[in-house]
């Protein structure tokens, strides 16, 4: 049957909305056709039509918001957007006069295909043999289900004008066709009517109903230029959608890029030049920042497997006046770049990251794949140089943060549950995976720092060659016993003998007071320190030197966390034989560090001896390492009690003789070596009762006992002043 049933109009609701930007069309065309290099197909008439030049209807009076639309922008409006039903019928019948004239209504001859074809449907989808049937089709299947906005109707369109995905080389990928609407403001093509209503509503909320917005959209280029840390990059229009773009760029990862830059800047002070690799370049912004700000101190290699990303990286290099080296040959495009000492050469490669890391050796490797990075760890440690640095950014937070526990077991081979310290647990899982990969290559690691924020988990380690270092690293991977009632935790004791009652290792007595099994075994995890204080202080100095103000608060928090010292009690004294830079009460060492002698060592034999001495020194300094994990003060607050301020509680814990500091993992977390029982007792001691809540529930203790009421009467301010702490 040639005619289309009227009930088959509604679009498939499973199709997603796609947005396109119209491009200028020739002035002579009655219906605008976009340029060939855009991601937009035109709205053609049927193939058999001779496509005569139809005279447009007289322009109706525009609404107040669209009254100032210029004629050029008005001509670019899609044919499915009309003000009256008569205007839509004029497109179908092709008459300049009234569509109700006898000449148009009585043209029931099937041979006149131009007057019997719907302008919004392809010929193979609908053909009418009478003008009455065509008018009924336009009214019922296009006009009645349209979306109205300020006097205009956005009718449903069945033409092959859905956008296609463009590429840099000009290729186009076809997309699934279907019924859709054209937005009158931004020319977006959206499949569902409800989505179109919400789309227009968002335009109204943003105030994007003026004609200048239409003109700005048409003049918008295909690629956008962004700037971050004095580095310009060119990105695709859909750069923020990793599933739909060839080169993903996430502005929320700015903190990650800055802290990695500080890491490389601190490493560049040790030896020059450094062979650096950004294994997953995408837009190349990270490698561009290295080469632009560190100059000749680094030799940057940016790699990506996608051909379009490699082309974009090369464009971004020339945009920042950096020379591109492809296959060890300088690539010259256009005018010769000026010879500036601050500009460096960037080698751009296109190959699998595992292959590249097997072929070449580097001093600094950064891995930032889409998802987990465990598939690239073996290759990274295979050829990395001694005392080099490997940084790993993991964005599979659903598995690391215990939302997809089966994925964590599959990728990292560990058992994990959601705990109050889940972010540090995620960091220790990644470090354990890195340590196992290094040990398989007869290498050990020294963790410089580990950061776990909302969008990523970043781990930076230094590589120590030799089987001795590998064995020492492997011993630091242990299982964790976690109590599910009170959330007390402790690493299992070393040894291979099976313990009769593993619950005795926990400081709590929940197993004796609670029925059933109360604890679970998590891991394997990294059980040693997560921070190197000396390296973090050098990173802080580099951040101050390069003016990276956004990252300085995080690095300061990491320094206090590594020393497990409150910020108000941080040590301001340092040996006189070191060069120091003071910043907010913290002395930053610039030439002295625990491993600074190793960096200046020349020769493989001497550096290996220095690495062994470093391992021995780390073993003696194990007692001064920060305590593992932290407690959330809100998680352990007492019902019916007002807990003290966080800074005041830190002072109280320090007064009781415990090491204490805040943590970047949790804004309300406290890292301390106090057991949970002592933590709760001190929290109870300095909490004040909520009298209304306590009286209503009958929880007010008797006055004769030494309870919370008696403890509150103690002068907290006097004790704080006696210990040198200020009351907040």
From Swiss-Prot:
Class of enzymatic activity (EC top level): transferase
Annotated positions binding Zn(2+): 483, 486, 508, 510
Positions where Phosphoserine occurs in the chain: 63, 607
Modified residues (Phosphothreonine): 23
Region (Disordered): 1-78, 98-118, 693-728
Biased composition (Basic and acidic residues): 708-721
Catalytic activity: guanosine(27) in tRNA(Tyr) + 2 S-adenosyl-L-methionine = N(2)-dimethylguanosine(27) in tRNA(Tyr) + 2 S-adenosyl-L-homocysteine + 2 H(+)
GO molecular function, one term: tRNA binding
Knockout consequences: Mice are viable and show no apparent anatomical defects. However, they display significantly altered motor coordination and aberrant exploratory behavior.
Residues that hold S-adenosyl-L-methionine according to the record: 257, 304, 352-353
Motif (Nucleolar localization signal): 132-136
Compositionally biased region (Polar residues): 101-118
Protein name from the UniProt record: tRNA (guanine(27)-N(2))-dimethyltransferase
Recorded name of the encoding gene: Trmt1l
